[in-house]
């Protein structure tokens, strides 16, 4: 392994909120949140009051009566996220984007041209700040896992370089929840087992960690606790799934509420699938109730689809099934659709109607083909005149009541 820490992890700080403050300078230095019924993102000024993503808007207002909510400018998030990644690509072609606001870069081969990895990290930070007006934190290390942790330690708007010889000392003093893949559930399991720091995890035998978390997760985290991470930068990584979600606050669990939301989400996802010729076979929905419990349902289809209406219809059926199983739940706070089992270039082969039902879920039937043609016509119109230029009637009419609040736009951009 190279003794020079050549992996950068760059993460735009409080990205959505920072963009809103950039677009409206009067919001700078003030507690703001993107969203409405649910906080999708918030500024550091809001975080100081204990506000965080996923918190109900009402609770956020209780903690900070002066908080300012904004609806979000998702096209600007995409544009500025793309611009920040473009800055990184000025110094190396080896950039792996993992979300709309963060990416890895391997700059070990760029030293002769642009200086040390630390020099490159400082230059990236300066350019993003001066050219885009956004704060960005960067971690530099020999492995992806450690670079990502270093960027978290660097927040807000900082730089942390982990030199060889100091890696385990740096890593083992940190809380275990900073590890990639340790969420609230895993953190709670670790806490019950008396594991609070990465160093304490490292001292546990791999077998005991596997008994606690399962073989795959336990083995992975045991290795990462010792900074054993052989993963290289994946510059040509293709997404294995595409999804979108909508935070709703507290809405009645009725079809009148959820169907327009699912149609809007299906439009977003299906447009991306068609743009990259990557139809899906598996559709998953997630329903989160007002008590924050989540339920998922999946269906794998006999044929791949990329048309909006079939995707929406599958999602609606899955959500109906969830609500039928949880009749006591009267309100929902979030809906999500995820598509997976993505295919490669879709070639449509028409099916002969040998007395079979003309099933609109099958793209090769007359009904399915007609739906596909309608969607592609809408894609052309939107490509020329913008997203709002054309829409399904039920989506447009229901949008003012059920507009999805959040789309993790990387999937839209880089399927």
Model-flagged regions — what are they?
Residues 1-226, 231-233, 271, 359-415:
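Gly/Gly-Pro- and Ser/Thr-rich, intrinsically disordered tail segments characteristic of DNA damage-repair
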Residues 285, 337, 386:
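Hydrophobic, well-ordered secondary-structure elements that form the walls
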Residues 305-383:
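C-terminal hydrophobic structural anchor segments
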Residues 38, 73, 246, 289-291, ...:
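A broadly conserved detector of short glycine/acidic/proline-rich loop/turn motifs that flank catalytic sites
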Residues 98-102, 141-144, 278-282, 330-334:
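Short Gly/Ser/Thr- and Asp/Glu-enriched loop/turn motifs at secondary-structure junctions
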Residues 9, 171, 178, 186-332, ...:
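DNA-contacting surface of Y-family translesion DNA polymerases
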Residues 14, 109, 142, 289-291, ...:
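Non-catalytic surface loops within mature trypsin-like serine protease
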């Amino acid at each position: 392994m190279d003794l020079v820490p050549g992996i950068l992890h760059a993460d735009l700080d409080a990205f959505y909120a920072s963009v809103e403050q950039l677009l409206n300078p009067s919001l700078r230095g003030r507690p703001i949140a993107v969203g409405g019924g649910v906080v999708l993102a918030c500024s550091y000024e809001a975080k100081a009051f204990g506000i965080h993503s996923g918190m109900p808007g009402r609770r956020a207002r209780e903690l900070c009566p002066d908080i300012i909510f904004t609806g979000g400018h998702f096209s600007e998030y995409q544009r500025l996220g793309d611009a920040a990644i473009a800055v990184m690509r000025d110094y190396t072609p080896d950039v792996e984007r993992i979300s709309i606001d963060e990416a890895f870069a391997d700059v070990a081969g760029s030293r002769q041209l642009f200086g040390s990895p630390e020099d490159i990290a400082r230059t990236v930070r300066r350019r993003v700040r001066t050219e885009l007006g956004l704060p960005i934190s960067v971690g530099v290390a020999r492995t992806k896992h450690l670079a990502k942790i270093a960027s978290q330690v660097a927040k807000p708007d900082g730089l942390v370089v982990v030199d060889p010889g100091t890696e385990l000392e740096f890593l083992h003093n940190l809380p275990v929840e900073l590890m990639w893949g340790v969420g609230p559930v895993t953190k709670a399991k670790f806490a019950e087992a008396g594991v609070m720091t990465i160093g304490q995890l490292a001292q546990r035998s791999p077998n005991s960690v596997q008994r606690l978390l399962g073989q795959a997760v336990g083995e992975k985290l045991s290795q990462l606790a010792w900074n054993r991470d052989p993963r290289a930068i994946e510059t040509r990584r293709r997404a294995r799934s595409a999804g979108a979600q909508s935070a709703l606050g507290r809405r009645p669990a009725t079809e009148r509420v959820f169907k327009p939301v699912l149609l809007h989400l299906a439009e977003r996802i299906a447009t991306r699938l068609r743009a990259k010729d990557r139809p899906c076979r598996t559709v998953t929905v997630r329903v989160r109730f007002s008590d924050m419990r989540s339920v998922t349902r999946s269906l794998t289809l006999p044929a791949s689809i990329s048309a909006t209406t079939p995707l929406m219809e599958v999602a609606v059926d899955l959500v109906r099934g969830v609500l039928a199983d949880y009749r006591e739940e009267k309100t929902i706070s979030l809906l999500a659709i995820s598509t997976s089992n993505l295919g490669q270039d879709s070639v449509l082969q028409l099916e002969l109607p040998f007395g079979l039902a003309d099933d609109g879920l099958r793209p090769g039937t007359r009904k399915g083909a007609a739906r596909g043609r309608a969607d592609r016509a809408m894609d052309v119109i939107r490509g020329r005149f913008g997203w709002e230029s054309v829409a399904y009637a039920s989506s447009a009419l229901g949008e003012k009541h059920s507009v999805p609040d959040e789309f993790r736009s990387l999937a839209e951009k880089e399927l």
